[in-house]
Amino acid sequence: MFRGHKLNLQRYYEGLCGKALFLAIWAADCDKVVIENPTPSKVFDFPPHTQAIQPYEYGHPVSKKTLLWERGVQPLVPTNIVIPNANCHEAGTWFMKGGKERQKNRAKTFPGIAKAMAEQWGTL
């Protein structure tokens, strides 16, 4: 968001729009709500998350913290804990390489996490 100690106004605006969408979903008149998001910038002052999960808790040997905001459901239970051998923040790992796929890779939902969500919350 900041480059050279200057605020990138476009990214800040997009972050504010993202927060507005988040808050609209969180405030929805629904008994059960789950929102998944990477750790947001502190400048946006999101409400506290209810759970932090890692891909390595669901069978993927990668460290990439993802936050969950849950209401009306039980916390997601790890299904296949493995030892991580890659971190999305380490220079040179597959996860953060530049190029056309970088944004897509950073937004990736790991299949093991999606499967756990479907199996644990899909019948609610």
Regions found by a protein language model. Name each.
Residues 1-124:
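Conserved active-site and SAM-binding loop architecture
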